[in-house]
């Protein structure tokens, strides 16, 4: 899992991700 840094200002919007890895190309 990825750790997020706590931001100084509270987050108003939540972003919803459906499929976590959607990147083009292969790793």
Curated annotation (Swiss-Prot):
This is Protamine-B. Testis. Its main location: nucleus. Protamines substitute for histones in the chromatin of sperm during the haploid phase of spermatogenesis. They compact sperm DNA into a highly condensed, stable and inactive complex. Residues 1-27 are annotated as: Disordered. Keywords: Chromosome, Developmental protein, Differentiation, DNA condensation, DNA-binding, Nucleosome core, Nucleus, Spermatogenesis. Coiled coil: none annotated. GO terms for molecular function: DNA binding. GO terms for biological process: cell differentiation; chromosome condensation; spermatogenesis. The keyword Lyase does not apply. The keyword DNA-binding applies.
């Amino acid at each position: 899992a990825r750790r997020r840094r706590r931001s100084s200002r509270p987050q108003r919007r939540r972003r919803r991700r459906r499929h976590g890895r959607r990147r083009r190309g292969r790793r």
